[in-house]
Each structure stands twice: as structure tokens, then as C-alpha cells.
Design a protein with these regions (language model features):
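Mid-length scaffold segments of soluble, non-membrane domains
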Residues: 84-126
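Cys/His-coordinated zinc-binding microdomains
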Residues: 64
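Bacterial signal peptide processing site
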Residues: 39-41
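Thiol/selenol-based redox catalytic cores and closely related redox-interacting motifs
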Residues: 108-159, 165-172
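Short metal-coordination and nucleic-acid-contact micro-motifs, chiefly zinc-binding Cys/His arrays
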Residues: 56
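Short functional micro-motifs and their immediate structural scaffolds
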Residues: 43, 68
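Short cysteine-rich clusters marking metal-coordination/redox-active sites
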Residues: 60
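N-terminal secretory signal peptides
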Residues: 1-34
């Protein structure tokens, strides 16, 4: 049996990436609660947790896609004991990873791009704390893998986006595993 692949890059479809996400053993969302306990002594550690800008060679940790080649918000996570961030070419992949029950590594910092400031078609910079961001789930704008979750620093920007492209405005803790299921369903266009 052959596996369906994305025609442009040859990567596995979202259906197969769910397995990759589980195998990646990337941090549990509960690990994010430790972010608020930083002290002055942890200042040098906090400096190393700042977001890293992507370049033409930055690839997604789940599927190897080059982040700079695709539209929509990107994400990065700093896991405990990790020198470099894990990058995601899509916010749906980020949330699917963080919300997966199999995840065991603690996420020390999570960043998404502020699409109220970044260019949707070629986002650069504008990294914000994912826990304080405002999201639009169910909108019509596509990211690297089809419909994605818009991320914004300001609620007004998220509401404007939802008014123009549809979707529901939610906070980080309101996004559920069912909203980011990589195995298929209404969220995904399997005809890609």
C-alpha cells in the first residue's frame, strides 16, 4: 500500500503525522505551568529561552517542511534540556503536539507568530508567548498544511481576522485536542 504524500514536498499527510507527533515525544501542555516560577537566578536561563528567528533552512520537527516556504503562522517550543527550539510549520501541529496525551517532555517556552503584525503569506519575526496569544480556530486562511489556527497578540486583531475569514476567537487553554486532530476530519483538506 502506498502512503498519500503532499505533492509539493513529498511529506506524509496529516493523517500520518499524528503518528509522528506521538513518536516525537514532545512536551506535555502541563509543563507550561512552570513558566511563571522564574526567579532572578534563572535570568540567564530565561535569556536562552527567547524565540529564534527562522531562516531559509529552518525545518519543521514533525515533517521536515521548510518553514519559510509556506504561508501562515509558525511556532517554536523550547523543551527542558534542549539547546535549540523545536519548530512547527503550522499552529495546528503545535497544538496537536502539546495536547497529545503521549507527550512527556516539559515545554519551558512556547512561541507563535503575531499575525496581526506579520505578513500571512511570508511571516517573519513577531514572536509572542503562545500562552498569552489569542487564536482564531476554524478560519478560512491556510497555513502550510491547509486550514490553520491564526495567532494574535491582540484580541482586536483576532476579532478582525475572524470577521473577515470566519472562525472562533479562543484563548490558549480553550483549544482542545478535537480542534487539532491530525488524523482527518473537517479541519483538513485531504485533497492536497
Amino acid at each position: 500500500m502506498t502512503h498519500p504524500y503532499h505533492p509539493q514536498c513529498g511529506c506524509a499527510t496529516r493523517r500520518h503525522m499524528l503518528g509522528w507527533a506521538a513518536l516525537a515525544s514532545i512536551g506535555a501542555i502541563t509543563g507550561l505551568t512552570g513558566l511563571t516560577g522564574c526567579s532572578q537566578a534563572d535570568n540567564s536561563s530565561a535569556q536562552s529561552l527567547k524565540p529564534v528567528e527562522i531562516d531559509g533552512a529552518t525545518s519543521c520537527d514533525l515533517d521536515g517542511m521548510l518553514l519559510a516556504d509556506y504561508p501562515g503562522p509558525k511556532a517554536q517550543v523550547r523543551f527542558a534540556g534542549q539547546d535549540k527550539p523545536s519548530f512547527f510549520c503550522d499552529t495546528v501541529e503545535l497544538f496537536a503536539t502539546l495536547l497529545a496525551g503521549e507527550q512527556v517532555r516539559a515545554a519551558q517556552a512556547v512561541y507563535v507568530q503575531d499575525m496581526g503584525q506579520a505578513d500571512w503569506n511570508a511571516p517573519k519575526g513577531h514572536w509572542i508567548d503562545a500562552k498569552t496569544a489569542v487564536y482564531v480556530v476554524g478560519g478560512k486562511r491556510h497555513g502550510s498544511m491547509g486550514p490553520t489556527i491564526g495567532s494574535f497578540a491582540q484580541e482586536a486583531d483576532a476579532k478582525k481576522f475572524a470577521g473577515e475569514y470566519g472562525g472562533k476567537v479562543l484563548r490558549f487553554t480553550e483549544i482542545t485536542p478535537a480542534m487539532v486532530d491530525l488524523s482527518g476530519g473537517a479541519l483538513h483538506d485531504t485533497r492536497m
